[in-house]
Regions:
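Conserved P-loop NTPase motor cores
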Residues: 1-105, 131
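Conserved P-loop NTPase motor module
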Residues: 3-14, 108-157
């Protein structure tokens, strides 16, 4: 993952144009000092090269457990937090200065609801995905099998 990102970063710096880099499972990079420092440097310098950076992780505690991870989150212009474990809510409550009500909500949000942060402002949001979007992003094994079966049936006709 680090090698691929490093290669992408080299391309971004030599061929400047507006782009968005999405790093899924970013917590994996935060486990090691070298890759965490690389991500932090990337986050700090991306804008200079017309690059938007989005980091995604399911377990924010792994990300926030790193000094560099905390710095990346703190320096981000926007954050989106979906349902979190109670222990993660405690950490996030301190970092994001959450109210008691926001802490409760964050621990109990249903799928598609979360807190969106832009600067000092934070609001409760509901994300509604279209059927096409849901098909692309679902991680539900049963839904994935149904999609595969439907696609196979469509190919048969």
């Amino acid at each position: 993952m680090y090698i691929v990102l490093s290669h992408i970063w080299n391309i971004v710096r030599t061929q400047q144009k507006k782009r968005m880099l999405i790093v899924d499972e970013a917590w994996q990079l935060m486990k090691y000092d070298d890759s965490a420092n690389f991500m932090f440097s990337l986050a700090k310098r991306a804008r200079k090269y017309y690059l938007g950076l989005t980091t995604i992780t399911q377990d924010v505690e792994d990300f926030m457990g790193s000094k560099m991870g905390r710095a990346i989150v703190s320096n981000s212009s926007m954050q989106l937090l979906l349902k979190q474990s109670s222990s993660a809510v405690d950490v996030l409550g301190d970092v994001f200065k959450l109210t008691e009500e926001e802490r409760k909500r964050l621990a109990n949000f249903p799928v598609g609801q979360g807190l969106f942060f832009a600067g000092q402002n934070h609001v409760h949001i509901q994300i509604v995905a279209s059927d096409t979007e849901t098909g692309l992003i679902t991680t539900n094994p049963q839904a994935t099998l149904q999609q595969a079966a439907a696609a196979a049936a469509e190919e048969q006709t």
